[in-house]
């Protein structure tokens, strides 16, 4: 059975807060314009508090898991963490969401608007976690 390495819990606490704020800015400023350019509707409704709470909570879980993978990958710089984060985004998040989209859970326009946000968020989180090891 594998043992989990020690990770910097301060970084695991800070990284989700930073990426949550960046995601909020992305969805407020970038995503509506991108969706409009792609021919989709620009959503103007506010996210419910319960949805935001779940989004934040899942980022803490993601940060811990990504921190463990960063230690296992021996990424010791922000650039190394960025690569691990982007790899995780492409290998896991984007593929899962693409599968859900293919089965009718969302549109491909929504997916196209989500891709940059996931790459930014995972990459930034990886960079923070690796730099702050």
Language-model segment annotations:
Residues 1-133:
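Juxtamembrane/disordered regions of integral membrane proteins
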């Amino acid at each position: 059975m594998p043992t989990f390495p020690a990770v910097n819990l301060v970084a695991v606490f800070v990284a989700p807060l930073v990426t949550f704020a960046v995601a909020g800015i992305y969805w407020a400023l970038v995503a509506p314009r991108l969706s409009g350019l792609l021919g989709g509707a620009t959503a103007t409704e506010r996210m419910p508090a319960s949805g935001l709470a779940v989004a934040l909570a899942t980022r803490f879980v993601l940060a811990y898991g990504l921190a463990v993978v960063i230690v296992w990958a021996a990424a010791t710089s922000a650039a190394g963490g960025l690569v691990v984060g982007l790899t995780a985004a492409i290998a896991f998040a984007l593929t899962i969401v693409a599968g859900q989209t293919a089965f009718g859970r969302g549109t491909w326009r929504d997916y196209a608007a989500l891709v940059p946000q996931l790459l930014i968020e995972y990459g930034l989180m990886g960079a923070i976690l690796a730099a702050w090891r």
